[in-house]
UniProtKB/Swiss-Prot annotation:
The modification Phosphoserine is found at S404. This is NADP-dependent glyceraldehyde-3-phosphate dehydrogenase. The gene is GAPN. CDD domains: ALDH_F11_NP-GAPDH. PANTHER family: ALDEHYDE DEHYDROGENASE. GO terms for cellular component: cytoplasm. Its main location: cytoplasm. The keyword Ligase does not apply. The active site is at E264 (proton acceptor), C298 (nucleophile). InterPro entries: Ald_DH/histidinol_DH, Ald_DH_C, Ald_DH_CS_CYS, Ald_DH_CS_GLU, Ald_DH_N, Aldehyde_DH_dom, ALDH-related_metabolic_enz.
Amino acid sequence: MAGTGVFADVLDGEVYKYYADGEWRASASGKTVAIVNPTTRQTQYRVQACTQEEVNKVMDAAKVAQKSWARTPLWKRAELLHKAAAILKEHKTPIAESLVKEIAKPAKDAVSEVVRSGDLVSYTAEEGVRILGEGKLLVSDSFPGNERNKYCLSSKVPLGVVLAIPPFNYPVNLAVSKIGPALIAGNSLVLKPPTQGAVAALHMVHCFHLAGFPKGLISCVTGKGSEIGDFLTMHPGVNCISFTGGDTGIAISKKAGMVPLQMELGGKDACIVLEDADLDLVAANIVKGGFSYSGQRCTAVKVVLIMEAVADTVVEKVNAKLAKLKVGPPEDDSDITPVVTESSANFIEGLVMDAKEKGATFCQEYRREGNLIWPLLLDHVRPDMRIAWEEPFGPVLPVIRINSVEEGIHHCNASNFGLQGCVFTRDINKAIMISDAMESGTVQINSAPARGPDHFPFQGLKDSGIGSQGITNSINMMTKVKSTVINLPSPSYTMG
C-alpha cells in the first residue's frame, strides 16, 4: 500500500514529503497541494508546497553532490542504477496503486509502467557504460595543411545539474527516462513531478534512495507551478532542462537562455490510410493508438486521414471494436477510464460541441459522467473544425476523408505539431515516400504511433519539441564533449 512499509518515511501524517539532501522533509511553508482522484473527484493525496528558498537549498546540494559523483567510476554509477531498477520492480505494487488513484491509469497498465521503468533504468546503465567508456582520437594530418604533430583526445563529460519535469500521463516512466541518463552521465538531478502523478514519482525516488545514491545527488520538489515553476526553470544553478508536457514547454524554452533543452511538447499524430491497406490491421491500430489510456498519450493517433474508397469499411470496423471496450474505473482494468482533470474533460467537450455544431457525424452518442468520457469516433470531420487541429488528449478521434495521398500529407504538414505519424499500405515504396514527405519526428509504417522501445530515437518537429530522446540520445544530450590536444615537438609518423 502507498506510503507504508519501506515507503513509510515518504509520508508525514496525511501529507507526502519532498526529498532533499538524502532525506524526506516537510516544507517550511506549512502549505500543501491537493491531488484529486480523477475517478472520485475527491482529494486522494496531499504533497508539500515547497518554497523558493527550499529550491535554492536543493540546487546548492545538487551542485556539491554532482562534483563528487562525476568522479565516481562509471562502473559504480551503473551498479547503483541496476540496484535502483531492481528495487523499483520489486515494489511495483504500491507505485502502481498510486498511478491508479492519481491519474486513473488502468491497473494492468500501471504495473506495466513501473516494470518498464525498471527495465529502462537497467538498459540505461548498460548503454552508459558502452558509450561513455569510449573516447575518440583525432590526428592533425587528416586536415589539409597540417603535419602529424597534434593528437586530439575527446570524451564526454557531464553538464552539471539536470532539471527533469515529466508529465502526468507517465510520471514514473518519463521521469526515469530523464533520471537514468542524467545519473549515468555523471550529472545530479532535480525532479519536479507533475501534481497529478507526484505521489507515484515520490515513491519511485525513494527506490533510488534505497539503492544508496549519495546525498544531494537526487532531489524531488513538489509544489505549485505559480510558486516554484519559473523559479526552477530559470534558476542559475540549472545546467540542463529535460521537459515533457504541453504548451508550458514553449514558455520554458523562451526563458531558458543558454541552458541545453530536451523537450517533447505533444502532437497531433496523423494516421494516413491508403486503399491497399490491411483494413483489419488499420482498425485494430486505430483503436489501440487512439483510445489506449483514454487517448491521453502524446503518441496517440489524433486524426485519421483515410482514402474515401475505404473509409466506410474502416469506420464500420472501428465502431465494432469501440463497442467492445470496457468503460469504467481504473481499478477494474477498464479500457476507457476518466481523464485526468475536470478541466481536461471540459476542454474535450468543447472540441466535441464545436464538431457537432459544424456538422461532424457522431458514430456514437456523446456521453460523459464527471471526468469519464465514453469513446467517440467523429466521421466526416472538416478542416474548419477545431478537433481537426487541436490535441484533445482524450477518447475522441476525428476521421477526415481524403481523395489523394497528397491531400493527407498536406493536412499532416499544415499542423503546428510534428511528433509522430503513421501510414498504412501494403506498398513499401509508397510508405517510404510518404514517410519522407511527412513532417514528423517519427513515422510508423503499418502500426500506430508509439514511444518505445525506449532505446529508439524519439523526437518531435516544429512545436512538438526540441532535441531527441531515447536512452542513447538522452545520455549524449546530457553530456558535453571535452577535448585535450597533445602537441608534439615534431611530426610523428607510423612505422614504415
